[in-house]
UniProtKB/Swiss-Prot annotation:
One of its GO terms (cellular component) is cytosol. Changing K159A: Abolishes all oxidoreductase activity. GO terms for biological process: abscisic acid biosynthetic process. The lineage of its organism: Eukaryota, Viridiplantae, Streptophyta, Embryophyta, Tracheophyta. This is Zerumbone synthase. It comes from Zingiber zerumbet (Shampoo ginger). Substrate binds at S142. Belongs to the short-chain dehydrogenases/reductases (SDR) family.
């Protein structure tokens, strides 16, 4: 029970990686507040995880500061504190790659959720954590935070920004005993990512098609990256096992971002 007695707030916790994080945290003894805009899914996940007093759901649009403030205050009042803040909510945005065709409003929407939402989560978690002189803030970035060409421009720019925010806030909050890190996974099969499979690679079995495409481009063969694997990395950064780790972008990509896939020296 690596999180016995801890309290965590997980944004975007109603589905995908966020749901896996919430489930794993519960398994390790934490109390969880799932924050999302998907009310029905969020309530269902909360109940599947045992409901009150182990898990609860709170409606929150992470782009609205009052929503984030209320979600943080609700969690702290219900459970007495917040030990772990997981900024997981995010979107990929339109599949448009050609910058000449990119919609500026869509670009701003991606930044609003993926960057501003993370900033607000950090800001309001800090309100609770600073007086206690401890806490862990973990945000979800992406392999697109360290390379280009793996996603649309807005998504890539936003995930780079998450890494910058993580380092900047870690530099400030270290004096208060608060650790701030982020996790950058390679392609993971979720409801958010699977529609971005190239049409030429789609199969009748959507999951099989996605995994086939991802495996063909992966550096590390013979293993698939799944939502629970990302949750395990977040768990590590949330626990005392990483007590001296802060400002880290933990890249979980099987070496994809460090390999030059065009030269094929090792073929």
């Amino acid at each position: 029970m690596r999180l016995e007695g801890k309290v965590a707030l997980v944004t975007g916790g109603a589905s995908g990686i966020g749901e896996s994080i919430a489930r794993l945290f519960i398994e390790h003894g934490a109390k969880i507040c799932i924050v999302d805009v998907q009310d029905e899914l969020g309530q269902q996940v909360s109940q599947r995880l045992g409901g009150d007093p182990h898990a609860c759901y709170f409606h929150c649009d992470v782009t609205v500061e009052d929503d984030v403030r209320r979600a943080v205050d609700f969690t702290a009042e219900k459970y007495g504190t917040i030990d772990i803040m997981v900024n997981n909510a995010g979107i990929t945005g339109d599949k448009v790659i050609d910058i000449r065709d990119a919609d500026f409003n869509e670009f701003k929407k991606v930044f609003d959720i993926n960057v501003n939402g993370v900033f607000l989560g950090m800001k309001h978690a800090a309100r609770i954590m600073i007086p206690k002189m401890k806490g862990s803030i973990v945000s979800l970035a992406s392999v697109s935070s360290v390379i280009a060409g793996a996603g649309p421009h807005g998504y890539t720019g936003a995930k780079h920004a998450v890494v910058g925010l993580t380092k900047s806030v870690a530099a400030e909050l270290g004096r208060h005993g608060i650790r701030v890190n982020c996790v950058s996974p390679y392609a993971v099969p979720t409801r958010l990512s699977m529609p971005y499979l190239p049409e030429s690679e789609m199969q009748e079995d959507a999951l099989r098609g996605f995994l086939t495409f991802v495996r063909s481009n992966a550096n590390l063969k013979g293993v698939d990256l799944m939502p629970n694997d990302v949750a395990e990395a977040v768990l590590y950064l949330a626990t005392e096992e990483s007590k001296y780790v802060s400002g880290l972008n933990l890249v979980i990509d099987g070496g994809f971002s460090i390999a030059n896939h065009t030269l094929q020296v090792f073929e």
